[in-house]
């Protein structure tokens, strides 16, 4: 069977961010379990604001992100906590995605900051639901104390949680991939 394909969308504009390091820990756990992973780091690959009246350029970064998400079985959304919410960078990316892109896909949530606050991931759950994605229950919320040099996730409980998130994401992604395939066959 083909490996589960996962795309991570990292919403931190900072190079070497702890948000990206938390996402990297989840991706490492996913790859150790056989998933094929790629990352779209919005700090290095920024997207323009959505202009719903603009002609769609199929080679623009936003169109490439849409294609990457559609090709994935699962998505990880990772964000720093900004003003008790997720980052504007991630919001811009989500504005470019629709129900046809995220719908029927498992979504894992990662955030960093605010004493492991869940505010960003709580709000992302609502956005994922509106896009008809399925946010898995286990999430990874980190703070400064969870990281060592690099930065690298080192807190044993946080590393364990990244592994549990990976397990859950892969289980849901496999079920949802099978469901999407069955629905596509009945549509023929």
Label for each model-derived stretch:
Residues 2-35:
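N-terminal beta1-alpha1 ligand-phosphate binding loop
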Residues 2-4, 64, 134-188:
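Glycine-rich phosphate/pyrophosphate-binding loop and the adjoining helix
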Residues 10, 41, 111, 139-141:
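Residue-level recognition of beta-strand->loop/alpha-helix junctions
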Residues 17, 85-86, 179:
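Glycine/Thr-rich phosphate-binding loops of Rossmann-like dinucleotide-binding domains
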Residues 19, 23, 62, 87-90, ...:
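A general structural signal for well-ordered alpha-helical segments in protein cores
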Residues 33-38, 133-135:
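A generic structural motif
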Residues 42-59, 150-151:
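N-terminal beta-loop-helix "entrance" segment that forms/cooperates
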Residues 57-132:
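Helix-loop-strand module that forms the ligand-binding subsite of alpha/beta enzymes
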